[in-house]
A protein has these predicted regions:
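N-terminal beta-strand/alpha-helix entry module and adjacent surface
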Residues: 1-121, 129-211
Length: 216
């Protein structure tokens, strides 16, 4: 797999639509295509790997919801994944994911609390020995819960495989590459800290990065 690291290179997406800055410090995985450019923040990526490891230990599936924003420029969709929240949805597998009204309510409350101003832009599914392809079941779940423009990430914690999928011509198609970017992300750090109660020890003076150290 191709991996390229760029540092401190300010890039701007320019076209017919409004221009916007791209992340400066990035790591390219694979070869991103021209229709969709996926940027996932490193704290988010670290959190997802931890979810996958825990799911493997507990021998069950797990899901999360992505927050961030989607921008379009010159026919290219730019997905900026800035946050991720675990989805408590009962039994989860590649054939069954069901979000109850209570699940959605909790997710929206947490988004408002931790990731205010961001929108749901996709979801994450992990399971032991999960195939890196979209089955009819996964396609059905995606369309029912999220809809076309949203992205999907699959991760197999055993084989250490992962892949992004975006909706195109009526199907979720695997993306040939994506970017991991690095920047301060206090919203995600706060969420990660909240999900690690063992860090809340009164005798210690904690900083937000302790959450990430625990995950990594």
């Amino acid at each position: 797999m191709i991996e390229v690291i760029y540092k401190d290179e300010k890039q701007t997406a320019k076209g017919n639509e409004e221009s916007f800055n791209l992340p400066k410090n990035i790591r390219q995985i694979g070869i991103p295509n021209e229709k969709y450019r996926i940027y996932i923040e490193d704290y988010v990526y670290t959190f997802l790997k931890k979810i996958a490891e825990k799911a493997e230990e507990e021998e069950k599936g797990a899901a999360a919801v992505f927050t961030g924003e989607i921008k379009w420029n010159s026919g290219t969709g730019y997905l900026f994944i800035r946050g991720a929240l675990t989805a408590e949805a009962g039994e989860i597998s590649a054939e069954h994911v069901e979000f109850s009204d209570l699940t959605w309510q909790k997710l929206h409350e947490e988004i408002e609390h931790y990731f205010a101003g961001q929108e749901i832009i996709g979801w994450f599914l992990t399971q032991k020995s999960l195939q890196m392809e979209v089955t009819e079941g996964v396609q059905r779940i995606h369309m029912k819960l999220f809809g076309g423009e949203k992205a999907l990430m699959l991760m197999d914690p055993v084989e250490k495989e992962e892949a992004f999928f975006c909706y195109d011509n009526g199907r979720l198609l695997r993306q040939s590459g994506y970017y991991i970017y690095y920047e301060k992300n206090p919203q995600m750090q706060a969420y990660m800290l909240e999900k690690n109660p063992e860090l809340n020890q009164p005798e210690q003076e904690l900083v937000a990065d302790d959450a990430v150290k625990t995950f990594r």
